[in-house]
Amino acid sequence: MITDDKVTEIFCTIDEFCKKLDVELQKNLKLPSSDGSGHRRRNRKGQLSDSEIMTILVCYQFGTYRTFKEYYLCSARQRMRSLFPKAVSYNRFVELMPRVFFQMMLFMKLAAFGSCKGITYVDSTMIPVCNNVRRYFNKVFRGLAKDGKGTMGWCHGFKLHFVCNDSGEIITFCLTGANVDDRDRRVWDVFALELYGKVFADRGYISQSLFEMLFDQGIHLVHGLKANMRNKLMPMWDKIMLRKRYIIECINELLKNKANLVHSRHRSIQNFIMNLCAALTAYCFFDNKPEALPVHVEKSMQLELF
């Protein structure tokens, strides 16, 4: 169970970011005082601040409760009553959640995520939204969720592609349908904006065209070999770092088992996106993030092509 000290730490970090963001928005963003019909626009503050809403969403991802309604009613409004004295009703809080999407995305990207350090690991994981038997009856994600097959079998939902550095920090992510291949160029166009150096992947990313495209952009894709492939020479340092892909596997484990990234109780697309952002944001506050063992890194800016 998350402690009050941890909740306070999360709130102070988010609140400080939100205050700086509000100052920048007031300087550079000019909102109209009225809408097109001539009526004045309301700008009244609510009982819960944006930082409090974001804190409640992030704290839910620490794995104590499996349903958000039980967490909010039993924990946020009772056990943490002293921390959130002006907590609104559950139905009202669900309506307020999409309001902090902009702030949550900026905090996740600017404060929670790390940066590329030249050593990157890439992986993807399935996010099912319902049982495969009920995929034809799902109305919430109709037209958005897709059928795809992964290492664990068929899945109806989405696929989360993400990359992390050797310190266990998530760099960026890309959400697609479950039927999108890991080697899809649209996914790597997003990743290439943040990456440089070497990217270590599993055998599912084997593609000559992908390797050449990334190599032209200064990114060296390193992956293992399949059993029916011809053996190729590989530097010993690449073999050592390729075996350290447990870093991103541990991140997958934390997001799925500790955080509530995967469940089939979403009632709207907006809440699904907010739950995804909250899970990725909460990961940066976990105390048991994986970290690679120190190894000797050769100081060379030259890419290796075989």
Segments from the language model and where they lie:
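Short alpha-helical elements
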Residues: 1-306
